[in-house]
Amino acid sequence: MTSTNHANRHHDARATVIIGAAFLSLCAAWMSVLPLFAGPDEPANFIKSAAVVRGEMVGSPIDASATTSFWSTYVDIDSRFGTAQQVPWCFVGQPQVPACDKPLSTLTAVEESRTDMGRYPALGFLPAGLGTLVGPSDIGARAARLTAAL
């Protein structure tokens, strides 16, 4: 191997690391300014991720109704994770209202933790689930976003 080839490979690897770090930094910045649970299905994903990392792969089925679907299940985890479902209702269906910021710690669980992602394949939720090990809190939700991005 010539020294030129070695230098080119080193330069390519360095550029790849720099681009990857820049992209991860951009993702982290975006995740830190986007209000929690403002993304579509983010509460359901947060709850499913918390369940998967704690060994609850599917949960107990719920009959489909006006507010649930075939995919909905109750999961046997701390009910405080389920409070994430309450956050978006201050702006859903109200296009003129910006996303609100209700800290999870201020909400009271009204039912078992329910996720509309209950029957989705569990493996994809594992990375975000690692972030939920911080707990059912705003910091836990942000950690779940970050570990999902990795």
Enumerate the predicted regions with their spans.
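Interfacial juxtamembrane loops and adjacent helix segments
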Residues: 56-142
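Conserved aromatic-histidine-acidic binding/catalytic patches
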Residues: 9, 13, 34-37, 115-119, ...
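Helix-to-loop transition at the C-terminal end of transmembrane segments
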Residues: 29-43
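Start-transfer (signal-anchor) and selected internal transmembrane alpha helices
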Residues: 1-28
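Selective detector of the "anchor" transmembrane alpha-helix that sits immediately C-terminal
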Residues: 140-150
